[in-house]
Amino acid sequence: MNRTYSIVWSAVRNMYVVASELARGHSKVKAQVCASEIHSLNKKSEYGQIIKATRAALACAVAAALGFFSPLAMADNQVSYADAQTHVLDASTPPMSYSGTDEGSALYVSGVATVGWQPTTVTGTGLVIETSGGGADDPDGGKYVSNAISLDHYAILELTDAKITTTGIYTQGISAADGSKLTLTDSTLTIDGNFGVMTLYTGSEATLDGTIVEAANSSSAQVQQGSTLNVLDGSTITLAQGQINVVAGNTATDEGSTLNLSDSSVSSAGTMSTIQGTNKAALNLTNATITHTNASGAAVQANNATTLDITGGNITSAGTGVYILASDARIDGATINADGDGIFITSKRKLDGYEDLNALTVSDANVTSKTVALNIDGSTTINDPIKLTNSTFTAPTAIKLGSKATIQAEKTMLTGNIVQTDASSSSLSLSQGSTLTGSVDAMFTTLSLDDTSQWNMTDPSTVGNLTNDGDITLGNASGSTGTLLTVDNTLTLQDNSQINATLDTANSAPIIKAANVTLDGTLNLSSTATFVAPETDEHFGSITLIDSQSAITTDFDSVTLDADTSAMPDYLTINAGVDANDNTNYELSTGLSWYAGANSARAAHGTFTVDAGSTFTVTSELDETTATSNWNGSKLTKQGDGTLILSNTGNDYGDTEIDGGILAAKDAASLGTGDVTIAESATLALSQGTLDNNVTGEGQIVKSGSDELIVTGDNTYSGGTTISGGTLTADHADSLGTGAVANSGVLQVGEGELENTLSGSGSLVKTGTGELTLSGDNTYSGGTTITGGTLRADHAD
């Protein structure tokens, strides 16, 4: 075999190269170099790793050419390609290694400095590449770092089933610069040093396809100066304390760098965020699994005008899930589970010169946190509405508003409280079936719900403005007293609005307070209190439901009450409406069914059913009313064996029907203006006044008290008349009906034929100028007085 050597100066590598060239098929050339230092980027990493180069000694090159190797050179197998050719390696290639304390690489590939730079391409299968070197003092400060692989000047390296290993503190896995490209397929990269998994500079690109990376200590992957890292197809990156850091240069004009992470996983236990993009970086995460097990830092962090796209996948963090600093984030179909904030947005610590991009859209995502699901930091600028679509946010605090923001939730479920910590005018809109379950403490925020959305309030809440066309349930899980919902400015309830509230009899405060109120829709009330029927309408109670600072001029379309009203008699109802005495209050009150309206628990009617042994007194004026039920709005019907007392002489209703028990009135004027019908065994009890109504039926009239009752109607009642005291005056005997008269007072009759049988200890007085004829079999014993006219008796008895 013929072997030739050449010693040449490489401007690319800044050193002399001595190569042994072995003739191979396909014009492939392998070059081995004894130099213990190879070309470096002469750059200092942001994280302190120092990568510099020194020029190899010509004597070492000559010694290598002549076959005289030092023990160190014989132990290492450094491989270098810088010839603008294509080289194919396989598993038969001896392991490549470098252990020198100066800067060096086990494998170095570089393009050639011709017009446009000619790439050198190396492909390999089953290669083993190792480094354990570095650590010597750098004259410029720091320590030299060795690399397993170094790529420079548009080099192309494609490896499959490679095993790349670094050991020792001052080692790094991969360094790529100046447009170089690296592809690792089904390979392993095991990092035991402190100085990095890889560093990509100046427009370089690395692709990990089905590759496993395990890094100890604080080793990280640095992607900077317009470079790109692709992590694809089941690749796994496990970082002990490091991160994937994607960053541009040091100024806002530098080109951004990119991370494309797809169908792969990255995890870290370090205090730094597992994945971080800074200074116009682009983070594209698709169906990725990202795990951060440290309470400090975040699983994903985007800083300074970075664009973040998360599609699918799972993000789990013991700290923050997604941290957004002056950047634009789009999250679609991902699951975020964090012990700290699920999503945190801030403008604080933004570097000068970078646009404050802060924007967020979330769709088809599930965000869960032990603290805050979506946290908007103070002093933060949000440029566009935050859009939440078909997503769930679950945390003790679902949304925290520390700065002005407009949040639009569509088909989204918010479980947790809404808390505002600043005084800016934010807004939260729920639409397209969105739900909020929690309380709201946001005095300066406008909350709105469309007709498909709902708010299940768990505790007393405060908002700036509330517009509701959906369903709101006012809850109080803590059992605190006071108002349930406070609207600092305007409450607007629209046509489809449903307000649901449970009344607490121990809490006298209004359930809603607002500065201005517009009512519409439906109010649904429920109560577990037991109803106790009062004995008079003077004991009716009321509860203020809504307390406004201005007049309430509108009303609900309907009000429902779910309560045990089995003990509530038919003549009583529960009414909801504006307080007649204070139009700034909307109240729930007990009232007469006579005046029931559209927002009463039962329809209006005129029936008073008073059970035996019970008495109910109506002091209110009963007038004709416009009823919406089958009742005519003017007829009073007394039912039951108890007693109904009418005490208002201003009553102006129509007919009276007494079907049972007693209807009593001190003054006959309380009976209204229509006819009176008294059923058999029923009683009309009067004390005074003029009964000018026509009285019919089989029941009786009882005159009580010491005053005078005047009866003037053409009466046909047949149940009899009882005078227990005072005077009963009838201008005509026909006014006394057809039944017997039991008189313990005075009966005065003017004229007519008194066919009734008179009994009792009372007296009979004939008044007026007319003629009165007595035809009954009378037994009264109080005597007879004729003050005028003629008194005739058919029989002396």
Predicted regions and their residues:
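Outer-membrane translocation/initiation segment of Type V secreted surface proteins
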Residues: 5-20, 39-41, 504-509, 529-632
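Gram-negative bacterial Sec-dependent N-terminal signal peptides
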Residues: 8-74
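Boundary/junction segments of secreted and surface-exposed precursor proteins
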Residues: 75-85, 598-603
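Extracellular beta-strand/beta-solenoid scaffold signature
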Residues: 76-80, 99-114, 132-152, 167-177, ...
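All-beta strand scaffolds that present successive hydrophobic residues in beta-strands
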Residues: 81, 87-94, 98, 115-117, ...
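Extracellular beta-helix/beta-solenoid repeat scaffolds
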Residues: 95-158, 164-166, 173-175, 182, ...
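Extracellular repeat-rich scaffold modules on cell surfaces
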Residues: 376-385, 395, 401-403, 413-454, ...
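Extracellular beta-strand/loop-rich repeat segments of large surface/secreted proteins
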Residues: 415, 420-421, 425-542, 612, ...
